[in-house]
Curated annotation (Swiss-Prot):
Disulfide bonds: none annotated. This is COP9 signalosome complex subunit 5a. It is found in: Cytoplasm; Nucleus. It comes from Brassica oleracea (Wild cabbage). Its EC number is 3.4.-.-. GO terms for cellular component: COP9 signalosome; cytoplasm. The gene is CSN5A.
Amino acid sequence: KNILTVEQPDSSSSDGIFYYDEASKRVQISALAL
């Protein structure tokens, strides 16, 4: 299965989660407040 890594930006950056999919070489930004 695809390996998905999740990273959280610093508080200085806008709130969001970066999803990086190595298989698709795509980066999606989700503006979800945790």
